[in-house]
Amino acid sequence: MARRSTKTPPPDDSYEEKILDIDVVDEMQGSFLEYAYSVIYSRALPDARDGLKPVHRRIVYQMNEMGLRPDRGYVKCARVVGEVMGKLHPHGDASIYDALVRLAQPFSMRLPLVDGHGNFGSLGNDDPPAAMRYTECRMADATSLMTESIDEDTVDFTPNYDGQEQEPDVLPAAYPNLLVNGSSGIAVGMATNMPPHNLGEVIAAARHLIRYPGADLDTLMKYVPGPDLPTGGRIVGLTGIRDAYESGRGTFKIRATVSVEDVTARRKGLVVTELPFTVGPEKVISKIKDLVNAKKLQGIADVKDLTDRSHGLRLVIEIKNGFVPEAVLEQLYKLTPMEESFGINNVALVDGQPLTLGLKELLEVYLDHRFNVVRRRSEFRRSKKRDRLHLVEGLLVALLDIDEVIRLIRSSDNSAQAKERLIEHFSLSEIQTQYILDTPLRRLTRFDRIELESERDRLNGEIDELTGILDSDAELRKLVSGELAAVAKKFGTDRRTVLLESAGTPAATVSLQVADDPCRVLLSSTGLLARTANGDPFGEAEDAKRTKHDLIVSAVPATARGEIGAVTSSGRLLRLSVIDLPQLPETASAPNLSGGAPIAEFLSSLEPDEAVICLTTLDESSPGLAIGTKQGVVKRVVPDYPSNKEELEVITLKDGDRIVGAVELRTGEEDLVFITDDAQLLRYQASQVRPQGRAAGGMTGIKLTEGAKVISFTAVDPAVDAVVFTVAGSRGTLDDSVQTTAKLTPFDQYPRKGRATGGVRCQRFLKGEDCLSLAWAGALPARASQKNGTPAELPEIDPRRDGSGVSLAKTVSVVAGPV
């Protein structure tokens, strides 16, 4: 195949070559200035009057032109984007849609201008918005205020990019949108970054400035104390805010809103419900994990994002035991986006020029714009009403002699002649005459003179009112102030962002961890274990006996980083670390242990048939521990607990014997009390029992009859009001759910006896009763409960030492006194 020949075409002599020499410096300066001005004026900076950039203004205006009112249905965002791009903003659909999405995001705008339907993204852009073909939108309720009266010659219009459409230079803006919603943008050689504010506060400041034009900044800041961010949070330090309100530039810090809560039965956690402006939870979680992995952040066990649409933001940061949550929080503020700085730079366009404005200047520019809008609106309305009044007056003249009007019209050869004759005969203007001629005869004859006169009077009144506004600056300012007040009443909301003068006293560093503060460790009747927030004694609230799990059977003083012992029924003492125990909230009444954790979680070595009898301190200066067994053995343990052992024997038990009671002596002057199942009670002073070492087996505490056993052992302070509670039953049905009678007797009714004696009778058995199924002795007030922690009532006090009992309304399984 032959190659195709390629010939160079001859030069075209019809074009004359012309080369211009241009200085590159001049060309770069000129082109760059044009580009910079285009970016500043047409893209990046908002207008100080309506607070909108061109793309936002075009979106709002075009939605208004499309009739997408708040009471209409939603339309696809793609349709709105197409209309805006085709008619007003030829810069690509992506940039327009991004701008539209921002106007619909409640976490970006303090008062959203677009009502979005669908996925419009999430805080921090962790979840991007859906494509425009899936989402829908319409104007928000407040958006109608931005375009209100735009068709009444309130603002100037200019041709669009191709000259086929008209677009407004600015929107009427019935509220100070720039301050309310803020703005951000990067231009050439300058940028703007303005935080949102509370609508009600901004309007209050604007109204004050209307009334007192010479108001100073301090006065205005009484109304606008600081930004009010859509995402809430806490602004720390107000000095930077005042600088920004004075000069247009300043910096402040935003902190997340965090509370310390019990996130599990054994651990505290930081619950984040509000994050700094523009910060999303994924960003915070990612940063925390990076810091933990790099070992730059200590004390965090886990981070969970429990955010949902129903409950809003909820970020749970679980704190390890032994770390101060407040101290960990300080580190989070320092190292993560949970604290961010916001640099205010109030740059906006004023008369086409970028200026840096303070709070007062921003309000003044807006108010000047609003005065101009209302003035032009009033002139437009007055003109329209004057035109209508002119027509009404013509109709009234015609109605005075309607028959003559009809005769003149019918007798005329054409409309021009009729027009001339009506003008000549009735002294009407051409406009009035033309309106009469254009009105069908059937309508002309139906006009009611009274209605027309009423309309004339109403129009005259409205014209006078509008003239008064236009002629009086005071009336104009009063009208604008009233309209602003109506906007605030309808759309105003409570402040979301808390303003703090300072961050307060910094928490201790994490390295210090939990301070070794005093506390109390509590054991409930249902086996729940917890520690209090401090070592103060708690009150004896009556409602405690109605609260489940509040029956405390053992309590010991401790410190947050200390240890205590748990005495078991098999004679062992097991060490417990106090820091691992769940901490109860501070309360002035009796504590509720529903926030505690089962003691078995902390004592993994407990046998299935082994129970914790009491808690004890490991302080060697205490009087020691008193122990009583089922076989009647008593022992006072010398407080000598080696710190290198997690498990100790506090008594050597005989075969078949078990501890039924153990109590830490407070003074050593208490009375020890044994109660047996055959209703014998023995009381004697603790001083009759010689303290013994841990390995000793104790001594005889009570002389038991054949077949009897001890069911209760305790120590009672003889100086306090105390009682003895006993419940009778039958040996054939020892289940405490089958109880017959019970008795509550003052403790002082039982005399002291010697150690190892048989004691005295504490309850007389009735028919069918042959043993005690439950017994307890202790100080008042005494409270009772069932096995599951449900409160139960005790009988009235019976002063008889050996009297019989009375029936119970509810089964009693546990009794306890104050601790």
Question: How should each PLM-predicted stretch be described?
Answer:
Residues 1-248, 310, 314-316, 549:
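Catalytic phosphate-handling regions of large nucleic-acid enzymes and associated NTPases
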Residues 2-6, 15-17, 24, 183-184, ...:
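C-terminal interaction appendages of subunits in large macromolecular complexes
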